């Protein structure tokens, strides 16, 4: 069945909202199950443990606030909580995406076929097994691009004043961009688009992708909703691929 999606690109907020609609479509739900289970088990357990540790971590982070900023502590404390949620949420989201990468790719492929009426290459368990080495190599490429930038931003958290004010904002912007890369990469990789070429393509619509990544990042911090965010974001990113990038980069039609 071909969807009513048009080639006219929309905002990143639109595509994120579409992800929630597309994830429950008949014929797509069975491809959602495995990514959903991985995310529920990992993110659910991780955030349960996080909330048992917040009363230790937040005072430690606030101890880096210099004396001349103590009068702002009532504002910096919420920023410290948000910082921990952002870093922690992105870290475990990355692990979940590594584990579920083959199934996320399959979900993106099947949804694209439904939205466009195109015929994808052979799929199924044997197709997934054949593609696992390529998929994991792609995940390593993303990790290698992400890690040095993340380390620089994490170091900022330990600089008095900057770590409690500027660093959370920079980390949020960085995680928004990285989550856009993470989820948009599944349909790009299904068409064997090189990682560097994919990043160049995303930069041509940077505002749209930042909007999409920002909402994904926010929902990753929200308990319960974050359990469902992985398949939702895959579906939203696939809808964006169909509207904005497929005409130029598709390998199969």
UniProtKB/Swiss-Prot annotation:
**What InterPro entries does the entry give?**
CysZ_sulfate_transptr, Sulfate_CysZ
Q: How does it sit in the membrane?
A: Multi-pass membrane protein
Tell me if Amino-acid biosynthesis is a UniProt keyword of this record: yes
Keyword Metal-binding present in the record's keywords: the answer is no
Keywords for the protein's UniProt record, in alphabetical order? Amino-acid biosynthesis, Cell inner membrane, Cell membrane, Cysteine biosynthesis, Membrane, Sulfate transport, Transmembrane, Transmembrane helix, Transport
The GO terms this record gives for MF are: high-affinity sulfate:proton symporter activity
Question: Pfam families of this UniProt entry?
Answer: EI24 (PF07264)
Q: Where are the transmembrane segments?
A: 31-51, 75-95, 151-171, 222-242
Where in or outside the cell is it found? Cell inner membrane
The cellular component terms of Gene Ontology attached to this UniProt record, alphabetical and capped at eight, are: plasma membrane
> Could you state one GO biological process linked to this protein?
sulfate assimilation
What are the coiled-coil residue ranges? none
UniProt similarity note: Belongs to the CysZ family.
What's this protein's function? High affinity, high specificity proton-dependent sulfate transporter, which mediates sulfate uptake. Provides the sulfur source for the cysteine synthesis pathway.
Name-wise, this protein is Sulfate transporter CysZ
Its source organism is Escherichia coli O7:K1 (strain IAI39 / ExPEC)
Designated gene of the protein: cysZ
